[in-house]
Amino acid sequence: MVLESFSASLRETIRKITGSSYIDKETVKEISKDLQRILLKADVNVKTVLQVTKEMERRALEEKPPAGMAHQDYMVRIIYEELLKILGEPSNVKLKPQTIMLVGLYGNGKTTTAGKLARFFAKKGLNSGLIAADVHRYAAYDQLKQIASEVNAKFYGDQSEKDPVRLIKHGLEQLKDVAVKIIDTSGRDSMDAELFDEIRRIKEAVAPDEVLMIIDATMGQQAGPEAKAFNDAIGVTGIIITKMDGTAKGGGALSAVAEIHVPIYFIGTGEHMDDLEVFDPKKFLSRLLGLGDLESLFETVQEADITEEEAQESFEKLMTGKFNLKDMYDVWEKFSKPGLMKKLVDALPLARIPGSQKIDDSKIQSAEDKLRMYRIIMDSMTFEELENPEIINAKRITRIARGAGVREEDVRMLLKEFKAMKNNMKMMKGNRGLKKMLQANFRSGNFGLEDLGIKE
């Protein structure tokens, strides 16, 4: 998960608040100190940390909760709103034909991000073309060409051309029928006049619709000065922060960049080409705090290619007890795509579920491995057995295990867990209040936030 330790600490603070019997001055001071420690550990600027916690304390002690809202929930709302202020404004990613110019220093993930952008726009129905305009790093051509093939994007490059302006103009002409043209420009090991002069020349000659700067999240609060230097020198329209999954300093990078008032368009959340996320401060913060993000939850389901009709049919089967192993197999197959289960877990409102614990990446990986094994086991079953698992006897368990290359205990565990799931669904079916609550929350699209008076 992005900012895993940061998120875990924030969620623990939320649980501490919601688990308190009352909120007094001592509790507010204690929560303030917790927040200061968490934010400083994430490399957020000291001045920013003090501003956030001072305002949080003032509001928690002076403001009265709206009618019908518990003081504990109102304090969570205050924390949400104060943290939101340091994350900047929502980006405005345009889903239309355009030319995008990527700039930034070496090692920040600029070339990889070019491929991720192409994959992102392809999902939105816009084909892309990648232009290799880094005329100084020899390996950049081959790297971008390989990435273009991986994401099924068109590619243009010319290793013999050393003038980036001529190269890009020719590339744009070659890719004129492509909706989104993405230019991977040269970087440097450090900011210098030569780099800025080259980027200015390209920008003036090409007039791109977007100039997006790529920044490494591991820089923490130092990302702010770097973004400011680029913006002052060439004028950037947006920021993409990479490697958010591999550092504890991502919070510092986000808050520092937000201070220069250049919108953050995307964040890189992993190594896969699909691991690029439009940055929406509200959704991002909601997940960090464990308040849930049903919009991302629905997007994940869409990414798994599950239609609304299929989802409704599966839900009805669950509620009526008609859900069988074949239905389970179909759902698991949809979610077998790398990274989907992780996205699903990140979107759940875990901090608002009593007794819930942090789900780290190792547990998610273990669950994915288990589901993969279960699918192999089900591949060794007959259609009749998938439709009616109750007919599977001890002799068949032995043959299924042998055919799947697993232990008999693994087959029994699958059948046991399936039976337990059906029993749980039967119990929920009889609880009208619980069923109504779940249906209402899923319709609202604000599970977790609505109870706090926070509107999307």
From Swiss-Prot:
Q: What positions does the entry give for GTP binding?
A: 104-111, 184-188, 242-245
Q: Which SMART domains match?
A: SRP54, SRP54_N
Q: Which reaction does it catalyse?
A: GTP + H2O = GDP + phosphate + H(+)
Compartment(s) of residence: Cytoplasm
Q: What is its EC number?
A: 3.6.5.4
Q: Name one GO molecular function term.
A: 7S RNA binding
Mind telling me which PANTHER family this protein's record contains?
A: SIGNAL RECOGNITION PARTICLE 54K PROTEIN SRP54, SIGNAL RECOGNITION PARTICLE SUBUNIT SRP54
The domain-related comment in the record is: Composed of three domains: the N-terminal N domain, which is responsible for interactions with the ribosome, the central G domain, which binds GTP, and the C-terminal M domain, which binds the RNA and the signal sequence of the RNC.
List the protein's name.
Signal recognition particle 54 kDa protein
Which lineage ranks, top first, belong to the organism behind this chain?
Archaea, Methanobacteriati, Thermoplasmatota, Thermoplasmata, Thermoplasmatales
